[in-house]
Amino acid sequence: KDDKDIFIARKKYTSQEQFKRDSIILWRDEICKKYLFGDPDRQETHLITETEVEQIPVITREVSFHNKFAVEMRGLWRTDNFVMGGPFVSYTLADPSKGMLYYIEGFTFSPGKDQREIIRELETILYTFRISSELTTPVKN
């Protein structure tokens, strides 16, 4: 069975610097260290961004996310104790009207399987994300 996970985080949007690769990785690792564990009873199993594999670097690129500027990031994650790992895809985008920066990610743990289709499924789910200014108010009858 494939393990597919999604998480969303937000924080105050302060500058374009927050869209830089290293800033996004740092924020991701802070979130993962606090909230995401391979085994919740063991702190050393928190997730981290794998940046030491030269053949598979963490890649960022500027994209349009619902016609808004965003940074897509792709790479590998692993637990701090090297027991688990896999690919992830994420998007970082701002809602300047609310002064918020959002990080949305999908990651999978499915050893021994082709994970391309799993990541594509997670991308599709992530793309349903909307910032509050994009939501429409229902028309009252």
Predicted regions and their residues:
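Surface-exposed amphipathic alpha-helical segments
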Residues: 1, 102-141
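Secretory pathway targeting signatures of secreted, lumenal, and periplasmic proteins
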Residues: 2-43, 47-50
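Secondary-structure transition/turn motif
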Residues: 10-14, 76-78, 107-108
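Compositionally biased, intrinsically disordered low-complexity regions enriched in proline and serine
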Residues: 14, 36, 89-92, 103
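Short, charged/polar low-complexity linear motifs in solvent-exposed/disordered segments
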Residues: 17, 90, 120-122
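A short, polar/proline- and glycine-enriched secondary-structure boundary/capping micro-motif
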Residues: 17-21, 83-84, 113-118
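Signature of long, low-cysteine stretches enriched in small and polar/charged residues
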Residues: 41-98, 113, 127
